A protein has these predicted regions:
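Gly/Ser/Thr-enriched, mixed-charge loops and adjacent short helices
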Residues: 31-36, 40, 151-285, 289
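Well-ordered alpha-helical segments embedded in enzymatic catalytic cores
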Residues: 62-69, 125, 208-212, 283-286, ...
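N-terminal small/polar loop signature for handling phosphorylated ligands or for N-terminal nucleophile
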Residues: 87-150, 255-310
């Protein structure tokens, strides 16, 4: 289909939500072409794109299509896999909670169990939940460190990591085979919460995850000796890291942790940074300001879904050195 035909198909869909219809009606020709000339591609790491109306955007219909593909893959594997189900988490971006529960609603229509976090959680905790709960897969609604207009949809395998190639290829084939995402049926979320097919999770998984985080400390004796004196400034850059990072650091024995409070608020617009990328020194501006104020030894930042970390260390001249990912990796390997 041409982009004009795709656009008309969307515009003619009677049940299209008002906010999407309004967006369609305000599109110029160039935007129409970009939004409808292709489908948002689902790859091995999932998909991400601009939020909005269109086949080349991320929205409830594109999310439904991806989840419908996953549901068909699970159905093919049988009832045991439907009972094991899918763990679902989401970050602080626009529409992240809606996309998460939209995914659960599609799965529920197929009789597939889902476990959805009650509020935003980091990607590493989603991976943990997949293994802890024994689910077949995990869905993470996030666009990682992309700018605010983006969101995304990642699928994880039963080990909490990237799906193995045979499952990933099958999932992609199922998604591509769906010709009309408007025809995908969804269950009533509140009704399925009551039935137990959609289970909301939170504190109990947090506690188990934090316990495992504590248990993987390599040298607790070293932390006990020096951790209380090390001054750390942490910023979650308006993302999910705020949910657990303070608690993880405190339970490990780091007693002097200051958080950049202006960036501890979940903000889908990431208002205090140009881009929420912790590998960019520009994202550390407020952390450096607080660091100089409190005399911090180390500055730490995480991206919106808290699976990417940036670090700066205090220099003798009082400035902060921004470490590259390679430098951080080398330091960790040596340690």
């Amino acid at each position: 289909m041409t982009y004009q035909e795709n656009f008309k198909k969307w515009l003619d869909f009677a049940e299209l939500p008002d906010y999407l219809r309004k967006e369609l009606e305000g599109m110029d020709e160039k935007t129409k072409e970009d939004a409808f000339y292709t489908n948002l591609e689902f790859g091995t790491a999932g998909m991400r794109g601009l939020i909005g109306a269109g086949t080349n955007r991320i929205n409830i219909y594109v999310v439904r299509q991806a989840t419908e593909g996953l549901a068909r893959l699970i159905e093919e594997k049988g009832d045991e896999f439907k009972k094991r189900g899918v763990a679902i988490a989401y970050d602080s971006r626009h529409f992240s909670p809606e996309f998460a529960f939209e995914s659960a609603a599609v799965l529920a229509k197929h009789g597939i169990k889902s476990y959805v976090f009650e509020s935003l959680r980091p990607t590493p905790e989603l991976s943990f939940a997949v293994r802890h709960l024994g689910t077949f897969a995990g869905i993470m609604i996030t666009a990682s460190h992309n700018p605010a207009p983006f969101n995304g949809y990642k699928v994880y395998g039963e080990d909490g990591g990237q799906m193995p190639p045979h499952d990933a290829d099958a999932l992609t084939d199922y998604i591509r085979a769906i010709e009309n995402p408007f025809a995908i049926e969804v269950a009533d979320v509140e009704a399925e919460k009551a039935s137990g097919l959609i289970e909301v999770i939170g504190d109990a998984i947090d506690a188990e995850y934090l316990k495992e985080v504590k248990d993987v400390n390599i040298n607790q004796k070293l932390i006990d000796e020096y951790g209380k004196d090390m001054k750390i400034v942490y910023t979650p850059l308006h993302g999910t890291g705020e949910m657990l990072a303070r608690r993880a650091l405190a339970q490990a024995g780091f007693d002097s942790v200051q958080v950049v409070e202006a960036q501890a608020v979940a903000d889908p617009d990431f208002s205090t940074v140009k881009s929420p990328n912790p590998e960019s020194q520009a994202a550390f501006a407020l952390a450096e300001e607080l660091g100089r104020k409190v005399g911090a030894d180390v500055l730490v930042a995480t991206d919106p879904d808290a699976d990417r970390v940036g670090v700066e260390v205090l220099q003798k001249d009082g400035s902060y050195l921004n470490l590259s990912g390679n430098q951080i990796g080398a330091i960790m390997a040596k340690y």
